Regions:
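Binuclear metal-dependent hydrolase catalytic cores
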Residues: 1-161, 167-173, 179-180, 189
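Cap/insert and terminal regions of metallo-dependent hydrolase folds
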Residues: 159, 167-212
């Protein structure tokens, strides 16, 4: 049976977030991540956060077959190093990402060693097939200082959209309304960017500089 497990739902910094005094007493929440279990028990992790150990514990496993990355912003990738020799000492983990994301990994010394050491095997495509499930990458607009951004459609008996970050619905939908856009991709379940409740949420910062 194909299953998706929610492993985190917070923005890059998690909760409580460093530098924020309004959430110190809130229950801890991990940065956004999901785990996909395919029909033969293969484990596919979406995003590599700094809370990798806690999130694998939630998932009930201590290793994964593959990692999917949506983009290069810190909360989605700062757990990559935990797969290396200092921690997990993993080998042969498939790494699914865009061409631009892979190029960034290759020119970042701390990450490129994960490729040369055989920790990750990079796989660049737009459609990936596993037992009982297909994963399709969809490019969406989001601050591309370092790489592009891709959401993922996970297609099994039902279709789930994993869209943890984007800039604005106007740019993502490109003239379509939200319901029509979701219907076009035959989405049954949508996990979407909910970083900000309102445009006035950030104190002492210009929210237009960090669109979500």
């Amino acid at each position: 049976m194909v299953e998706v497990t929610l492993l985190g739902s917070a923005q890059d910094g998690g909760v409580p977030q460093v530098g924020c005094d309004c959430c110190l007493d809130l229950e801890q929440r991990y940065p956004v991540s999901i785990g996909l279990t395919d029909a033969e028990g293969g484990k596919h992790l979406f995003e590599a956060t700094r809370h990798l150990g806690d999130q694998l514990r939630i998932w009930g496993c201590n290793s994964v077959d593959s990692v999917f990355l949506t983009h290069a912003h810190i909360g989605h990738v700062d757990g990559l190093g935990l797969f290396g020799k200092e921690t997990m000492a993993a080998k042969g983990v498939n790494l699914y990402c865009s061409k631009l994301m892979l190029e960034l990994i290759e020119r970042t010394p701390h990450w490129s060693t994960l490729l040369s050491d055989g920790v990750f095997i990079p796989r660049v495509a737009t459609v990936y097939q596993f037992p009982g499930v297909i994963v399709e990458a969809i490019e969406v607009p989001h601050r591309n200082e370092l790489s592009d951004m891709h959401a993922y459609l996970i297609k099994a008996e039902k279709t789930l959209l994993f869209l943890p970050d984007h800039d604005t619905w106007q740019e993502t939908l490109r003239g379509h309304d939200l319901r029509a856009w979701l219907n076009h991709f035959e989405v049954d379940i949508a996990l979407i960017d909910g970083t900000f409740y309102s445009a006035d949420e950030l104190k002492h910062r210009d929210q237009s500089k960090v669109p979500h």
